[in-house]
Regions:
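Acidic, divalent-metal-binding catalytic cores of TOPRIM
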Residues: 1-208
Length: 208
């Protein structure tokens, strides 16, 4: 039973063995990882951030997503000339621009700079932190909370002093960045802003 003759031999039918499907892999941002993880050709749209630490944190959490979408994150090195830089970039429906600035407080220089840009293909968002370090949850790096530093004192130096850390800011940044393994280690306001910027620039119309 269960046998049949094929080319003179008795053979049996067997169900094809299927590889067991494991759970979907997730990226650090919480997205389902794509099977094809090769980077795509960069799209013309861009995301600009103010500092290298901002760029490194975004790469740490959203790097896989950005490479898959073909979105490049570039460092502004200061936003004083933002309006002129936006004009030079020439945003349009095929080439959108997302900008992440430090906290935009009413009446601040950054707020005035952002107000100079009025273009439907540009989205400017901020995060509510004095420094991008604060966007990392204290618990992720083993502290109760980020220390308060008086206005006028260097924030990074003040934090290191109050935490009793002897390292210089660049070394401490590498340490705390290494503690970030996913979006769960980052404060919600930054997560929301970055996700909105990615959604905005990836929604640009394809070029003909």
């Amino acid at each position: 039973p269960g046998l049949f003759r094929h080319e003179g031999d008795l053979v049996a039918l067997r169900a094809k063995l299927l590889k067991k499907q494991g759970a979907s892999q997730m990226t650090a941002s919480g997205s389902i990882a794509a099977e094809d993880t090769s980077a795509r050709v960069a799209l013309p749209s861009r995301i600009w951030v103010e500092g290298i630490h901002d760029a490194e944190l975004i790469e740490r959490v959203w790097g896989d997503d950005l490479r898959y979408e073909g979105i490049v994150v570039e460092q502004l090195e200061g936003a004083d000339d933002l309006a002129a830089m936006v004009r030079e970039f020439s945003p349009n429906s095929h080439q959108r621009l997302g900008v992440l600035l430090d906290h935009l407080v009413d009446g601040s220089k950054e707020t005035r700079i952002a107000a100079q840009v009025d273009d439907p293909n540009v989205l400017i968002l901020d995060h509510p932190y004095v420094d991008i370090w604060q966007a990392i949850k204290p618990g992720a790096i083993g502290i109760q909370g980020w220390p308060s530093v008086p206005k006028g004192e260097s924030w990074k130096e003040g934090v290191l002093k109050r935490l009793g850390v002897a390292a210089a800011p660049p070394q401490f940044w590498k340490h705390i960045l290494g503690k970030v393994s996913s979006w769960k280690d980052v404060e919600t306001p930054l997560v929301n802003s970055v996700e909105q910027l990615i959604d905005f620039v990836t929604a640009a119309e394809p070029a003909d």
